[in-house]
Amino acid sequence: SRHGKHNWMEVENFDFDCDGSDEVLITTPLGSLVIDTHKGGMLTELDYRPASFNILNTLARRPEVYHKKIIASNSGGHGEGGPASIHDISRSKEADLHLHLHYDSYRRGMLIDHIFGDNTTLESVMQNKHEEIGGFPFIPYTSSIKDVRNGKVVALAGEGLIHGTKISITKNIKIEHGSPDMEINYAIRHVSGEPRDIWFGPEFNFAMLNGKSEFCKYYAEGGFLEDSCQTSKGESKEITYFGIENRLISTNIGLSFSEACTLWRFPIETVSQSESGFEKEYQSSVLIPHWRLHLEQGGEWGVKIRLTMREI
């Protein structure tokens, strides 16, 4: 059987999340990935077999019933108009938890294609309150699978309107035999309409188990960041390589960019309820490389991103 060989690769269309639409599932000896072509061609699962770990084991932030108690205890009210009980207040294990109640409009995955509005900030993206132009995380992408030397390419493409200008985003994801790495070739094309300035950023989520562990650190070309834990947030400029060293799962993750980018990093944290009270809970680390570009009529801009995973 092909599974007796080292270099087998299976590609199938399968309704992996039971939402009525097929996803693309690619499996190799080193791992598997799931691409949701109906929601922006994003990756929703990325298994790295050497670590027995799904790097995308995260979730979208959603309202929970008990969040009302947190808001009420902060405002001095109690939902129904009465005062918040001492019990409700004392159950918050951290101060100002109400400031961390943010909710997501899309699933947190990988290769989520954003076109940002001019007033976008790291904080607004972190809170999911930024202006999303073109709706790329929500639209269906076309998909096709191509055989190439030493592997396969999944070709994905979507179109959207940026202030009246039609723009296409194509991303070709190359998976090679015998390698856990992915090479993503992006092309942003001006299809029709006026010339346009575009602020493009693909989102990567990495579920790293523990946001505050000293065994899980961000690094760039110059070594570990000064604030390197997974709950840190910040902006790094002129980046061509960025990574996460995670000794909890003995894995080194790297992202390299053919065009220098500005890179945002921040954690996805939910406010959860446990027996001991309300508290923030780390879910994943978000990395968003982004570029500002100008497209004339018929113009095109491209970047190559390589995602590497290595045992350490």
Task: Please annotate each region the language model reported.
Residues 3-20, 29, 58, 128-185, ...:
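Beta-strand-rich recognition/accessory modules
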Residues 23-25, 32-34, 199:
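Beta-sheet entry/capping signal
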Residues 24, 42-48, 242-244:
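Short polybasic amphipathic segments
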Residues 25-26, 188:
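Hydrophobic beta-strand positions
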Residues 29-144:
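Acidic-aromatic substrate-binding/catalytic surfaces of carbohydrate-active enzymes
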Residues 38-64, 69-71, 165-169, 177-221, ...:
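Acidic (Asp/Glu-rich), glycine- and aromatic
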Residues 53-55, 61-65, 72-76, 213-217, ...:
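Short, surface-exposed, polar/charged, turn-prone segments marking secondary-structure boundaries
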Residues 194-199, 204-265:
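Active-site/ligand-binding surface loops and adjacent short beta/alpha elements
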